[in-house]
């Protein structure tokens, strides 16, 4: 039996005792019963009255990342008297999980509700539930209040080392190396001069050539990076909270962070649910996180069709993120290779999400002739995996 049914039953039992005593004409019983029945009824009515007089507003956390615990601030905006055990809880849409409601005291005027951000996204909060006990502690009462608010949960990402040391480049010829796509490039080798700090001596080259050498490095010219995200829904494998598209978003955020940290700029390419392609360029990280938080896999365009709609910057390093590769990608990849800008094709491993036969071995062999290809799985150490992929692709 629910608490509400028990509370109503108690009121009706008291009411029936009062009526019965009145019918059989027992004045003293009528008086006692009416008095005892009026106490909880009065407590209930007063509690409801004061609860409906209370108005709260809510403040949602900013900069919250998927997998973190967040706090929603509930402030009492208006109130005459607070019933005991007053709490406020926002009606959170799934998959957000409320951990503990906010306890409110009129004197303090505010409380914190704890919740867990299970998945990235943009969540609109429309209601809060105010709960309390009556003044006698017999009944539990509650009501809903309309609110308007939006909360953004950013995607999670990893910070990996994007500065690359090409220790072997240019060593044999004792000359300069080719610029890398961001990071540090090998510049030159020269003999150590008297008066310089011994710390600058490269002992490996010294042992090889029999003389003291110094290796000079210079900051490589930063390159922009274009990240194309496949938003085709048929290419999403896994459940609502953990799937290949969510892995793509995490990889995109991580690559964007590394590129910006390395002095470049980032262009995000995707298609919306109407099949309209979008291309947005960024030089700071927070707007990228906000875009990725809002992105959904609802586009009718496959990745190959999206790429046909775009005129991409030839000077930008191109990264393609998908979990549904097919032969239709080969013409685009071949064209980019002929232009001297081989893309980086990152495949989200659908087999790690329970999908078998998601791509063929012959396709993988074909595509390797035109692009750097890497497969990223759910169980991979993403930081180490991206560091290795970045190093391989940057050295091409």
Question: What do these predicted regions represent?
Answer:
Residues 1, 83, 359-360:
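Accessible peptide chain termini
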